[in-house]
UniProtKB/Swiss-Prot annotation:
This is 2-isopropylmalate synthase. Mn(2+) binds at D13, H201, H203, N237. It comes from the Bacteria. Residues 390-506 are annotated as: Regulatory domain. Catalyzes the condensation of the acetyl group of acetyl-CoA with 3-methyl-2-oxobutanoate (2-ketoisovalerate) to form 3-carboxy-3-hydroxy-4-methylpentanoate (2-isopropylmalate). GO terms for cellular component: cytoplasm.
Length: 506
C-alpha cells in the first residue's frame, strides 16, 4: 500500500485569503502544529515577497525539526537565492520554483515563447539544485496547458534535477476524470517520470478540489498539496484533512495510506480558524461542529443501537474530544504542565509560570476547564505575549440614554503607560474609540465576530475583528471569559498590527 505525503501551504497559499494577515508569531504557532500533525512538507511562505515574509520563513526554517521547510520562488535567480538564504538553516530545506506553461499565461502574463519557458525552467531548476538538496517544480496552470508541451516542460525540469513535479489546477478548472487522465498521460509520456515524485495542487473554484486530489492519487500522485480547512485565495484550496481522512477510510479503494497524524486534525483546524479568523462552517466535513451530530430520530436510534449504522468516522480518529472536564482550580503546576505536554505544548520556565498564572485566574472563575479551554488559553497568551500593546485596565460605565463611556489603560513593550477615555453608542464602540485615541488611529471596523469556545454560562469568548485604514486591512483576536475584555483584546491585537504596518510602509 503506497504512502501519500502531504505538502501544506496554509502559511503561503492559505494566507492569501482576503482579510487574512498573520504575524510571525502566529505563523510559527501554525508551523509547530503542522509539525505535530505530521505534515511532510510545509511551504513557509514566499521569501522574496517582502522582508517580513523572509524573516517569517527563516524563523520557521530554523525552528522546525521534523518536516521539510520550503519557500516559493519564481523562476528568477534573485528569488531562488533569497529562498535559499531563508531556508538554508532548516533540517530539511526545499525550493519550490514555478513557471506558467499554459498558452494564455505565456502570451499575456509572461510574454514568453515556449522555447523561452523551457530554457527558463532548465536554468532555474539547475540553479536551485546547486543550492538545495531537493527542488520542486510547478507548471503553473498545468490543467490548461497543452498536454504535449506540459510533458516536455516536465521532462526538462526532471533532467535539470527536479525531485518533485507539481501539476497544479491553478484556477480550479479541471474535473476528476480529466485530472486522473492527465497524470496517467504524464506517466506514459515523460521519459524520466520514475526519477521524480509527482504532486497535485487543486483549487476549489468549481467545488472539486478534494475530489480532484483523490483522482490524482488514483492516477499516480504520491504527494497532495493543500491547506488546513481548505482556506486560500478565491474559493480556496483542497482541504488536506478531508483528503487524508478519505484516503484512510477508503484505503480499500485507493490502496493508499495518508502520512499524517490524524488525531491532530481537530486541534490544527481550530488553531488555523482562530488565528486567521476564518470560521469553519458547521456542516464542513471532518472538522465542522455538526460533522458527528445526529438530529434525525431514526439516525439517533440507529447510532444508539450500533454506531456504524450512520457514522463511518470515529470522532476520536481526528481528535474530536468529548470536551470533558480535565483540570480545575485545585490542579497544581505539575498536573497542569503534564496536561499541556499531552496536548503538544512545551514551555520555558518563564513561559510556564505566565501560562499557569493565567490558568489559575481562569480556574477561579470557571468551574471546569476543558481541553478546548486550555488550547484557547494558550492561543490567547501567545497573542498577548507577542503584542506591542497590552491592556492593563478597562472600565466601562453608563453616561446617558444609550451612551457609554470607556476608560482604557495600555502598556507598551517598553513599559510606557497610556490612558484615555471615550464615549460611544455602546460599550464596544466606546472601548474601541478610546483605543483609537491612544494609538492615534482612524480606522474602520470592517468585521466583528464573537464565538463561544465551550458551552455553559462560564464559557470563554473568542472575538475576531478586522480593521481597515485605506488599502491596509488586518485582523486580530482576543480570548477572555468576559466579552468586553475579549473584544478589547481583539481590537488592541489588530490595531497594533495596523499601526506597525502603516509605519513600515511610510
Amino acid at each position: 500500500m503506497k504512502k501519500i505525503l502531504f505538502m501544506d501551504t496554509t502559511l503561503r497559499d492559505g494566507e492569501q485569503s482576503p482579510g487574512v494577515n498573520l504575524n510571525e508569531q502566529e505563523k510559527l504557532q501554525i508551523a509547530r502544529q503542522l509539525e505535530r500533525l505530521g505534515i511532510h512538507v510545509m511551504e513557509a511562505g514566499f521569501a522574496a515577497a517582502s522582508e517580513g515574509d523572509f524573516q517569517s520563513v527563516k524563523r520557521i526554517a530554523n525552528t522546525i525539526q521534523n518536516a521539510t521547510v520550503m519557500s516559493l520562488a519564481r523562476a528568477k535567480e534573485s528569488d531562488i537565492r533569497r529562498a535559499y538564504e531563508a531556508v538554508k538553516g532548516a533540517v530539511s530545506p526545499r525550493l519550490h520554483v514555478f513557471l506558467a506553461t499554459s498558452d494564455i499565461h505565456m502570451k499575456y502574463k509572461l510574454c514568453m515563447s515556449k522555447e523561452d519557458v523551457l530554457d527558463s525552467i532548465y536554468r532555474s531548476v539547475t540553479l536551485g539544485k546547486s543550492l538545495f538538496p531537493t527542488v520542486q517544480f510547478s507548471a503553473e496552470d498545468a490543467t490548461r496547458t497543452s498536454r504535449d508541451f506540459l510533458a516536455e516542460a516536465v521532462e526538462v525540469a526532471i533532467r535539470a534535477g527536479a525531485n518533485v513535479i507539481n501539476i497544479p489546477d491553478t484556477v480550479g478548472y479541471t474535473n476528476p476524470e480529466e485530472y486522473y487522465s492527465l497524470f496517467k498521460y504524464l506517466q506514459e509520456s515523460v521519459p524520466s517520470y520514475e526519477k521524480a515524485i509527482f504532486s497535485c495542487h487543486c483549487h476549489d473554484d468549481l467545488g472539486m478540489a478534494v475530489a480532484n486530489s483523490l483522482a490524482a492519487v488514483e492516477g499516480g500522485a504520491l504527494q497532495v498539496e493543500g491547506t488546513i480547512n481548505g482556506i486560500g485565495e478565491r474559493a480556496g484550496n483542497a482541504a488536506l484533512e478531508e483528503v487524508a481522512v478519505a484516503l484512510h477510510i477508503r484505503k480499500d479503494f485507493y490502496k493508499a495510506e495518508p502520512s499524517m497524524t490524524l488525531k491532530e486534525i481537530k486541534a490544527t483546524s481550530t488553531l488555523v480558524s482562530r488565528l486567521t479568523g476564518m470560521v469553519v462552517p458547521k456542516n464542513k466535513a471532518i472538522v465542522g461542529a455538526n460533522a458527528f451530530a445526529h438530529e434525525s430520530g431514526i439516525h439517533q436510534d440507529g447510532v444508539l443501537k450500533e454506531v456504524t449504522t450512520y457514522e463511518i468516522i470515529e470522532p476520536a480518529l481526528v481528535g474530536e474530544s468529548q470536551n470533558l472536564f480535565v483540570l480545575g482550580k485545585h490542579s497544581g503546576r505539575h498536573a497542569f504542565t503534564e496536561k499541556m505536554k499531552e496536548l503538544g505544548y512545551e514551555f520555558t520556565n518563564d513561559e510556564r509560570d505566565a501560562v499557569f498564572e493565567a490558568f489559575k485566574k481562569l480556574a477561579d472563575r470557571k468551574k471546569e476547564i476543558t481541553e478546548e479551554d486550555l488550547r484557547a488559553l494558550m492561543l490567547g497568551e501567545a497573542a498577548f505575549a507577542a503584542q506591542q500593546y497590552n491592556i492593563t485596565q478597562l472600565q466601562v460605565h453608563f453616561v446617558s440614554n444609550s451612551t457609554q463611556c470607556a476608560t482604557v489603560v495600555l502598556k507598551d513593550e517598553e513599559g510606557n503607560v497610556f490612558e484615555d477615555a471615550a464615549t460611544g453608542s455602546g460599550s464596544i464602540e466606546a472601548i474601541y474609540n478610546a483605543i483609537q485615541r491612544i494609538l492615534g488611529l482612524e480606522c474602520e471596523l470592517a468585521d466583528y465576530r464573537i464565538q463561544s469556545i465551550t458551552q455553559g454560562q462560564d464559557a470563554l469568548a473568542h472575538v475576531h475583528v478586522e480593521l481597515k485604514e485605506g488599502a491596509h486591512q488586518v485582523s486580530g483576536f482576543g480570548v477572555a471569559q468576559d466579552v468586553l475584555e475579549a473584544s478589547a483584546r481583539a481590537y488592541v491585537h489588530a490595531a497594533g498590527k495596523l499601526k506597525s504596518f502603516i509605519q513600515l510602509v511610510k
